Amino acid sequence: MDPKNKVALLTGGARIGQAVAHSLALLGCNLALVYRGSRDAAEATAQAAIREGVRAITIQADATDEDQIARAVQETDRELGGIHILLNMASVYLETPEPKKVDWSNIVDANTRSVFLFSTAAAPIMKRSGAARIINFADWLPASGRPRYKGFVPYYTSKAAVVALTESLALELAPEVLVNVVAPGPILMPPGLSSAENDEVIDATPVRRWGGAEEIAKTVVFLVQSDFITGECIRVDGGRHLY
């Protein structure tokens, strides 16, 4: 599918979302940027897209609230004339050393249920276009088939569920909507990472570097433009899963 003159709805994503939005804008894709609290970042991303000659709007919505999700989808359709690409990037990354004491619903709602709600809300509009794409976001860890790190039980479980949900949606929404999932690995160095911790990540990554947000953007564009891939999980982790 050629993204030119199409409409993409993006949820969350922060720095990676900005790179994805920019790449789509360069290809002539109009954007609806859904944010919960980062209004300034969303507005800056929208203005950057507008400078590239496309339409871009921002919508404040909580990705765990079904009514707000429905409103965001309807506003995108009304203002931009459809939805051809849905990028479910909103996520919560939370360390939980004592998972029995954590409210799992907050993590599962943000990471998994939001994907289902946005996808099912947008699906009728997307099917109407005849050709559409849903791209979800998981994590290289659950995509690797083993957790590796202690203290992230709800997060790991919720992201593994996104992979399974992607496969289910791919079957349910075919042939009009192709549904895939991206599983990022060491893409952006977290703030506050020590030199020793950075070295540990690099040593455990075969390509010996952080990927950068542009690698995710290129993967998204590939999945948008591909016409015969659905129900697939693509790890973008520099080979991190091999260690």
Question: What are these language model-derived features?
Answer:
Residues 70, 91-106, 146-154, 191-196:
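Conserved mid-core segment of classical short-chain dehydrogenase/reductases
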Residues 84, 100-117, 135, 155-158, ...:
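Catalytic Tyr-X3-Lys loop
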Residues 92-96, 127, 133-161, 166-174, ...:
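Catalytic loop of short-chain dehydrogenase/reductase
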Residues 110-130, 170-175, 221, 225:
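Amphipathic alpha-helical dimer-interface segment in Rossmann-like NAD(P)H-dependent oxidoreductases
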Residues 174-178, 230-231:
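Short, small/polar-rich loop/turn modules that mediate ligand/substrate recognition or access, typified
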Residues 209-236, 241:
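C-terminal substrate-recognition "lid" of short-chain dehydrogenase/reductases
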